[in-house]
């Protein structure tokens, strides 16, 4: 039996390393995902993206596939939910769009980095997002592990969308 290079066996410290630099800390139930800051001001569409995709509208850029982040969260014992979606329903003679909310377990997202003065900084991801035009910090947000879905060809949609 061979072990794929994308997963390395846990060390005695309870840490599993995945491809893309992902580190699963089993004892503390933490997943560390390396990233770099793409933009420090401007409008954003999402918090993070893959390199070569939406750097112009994301705060962070990661080099690992979303399916590996999903795997890491499963490795620390979380259960994925289902992403939110829109569904068209016929009501009488009309069609309406119904919002189906996401489901999943709550997660806390923290950001750790060294600032330009060499100081270590740790904050919630919400503290990295400011409202406009008043500049208020984004309110504490209940993030959840929804995962993604698989398309008809069996591909994890978040890996290519």
Where do the protein language model's features map onto the residues?
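Long, low-hydrophobicity ectodomains and other hydrophilic envelope-associated domains
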Residues: 3-161
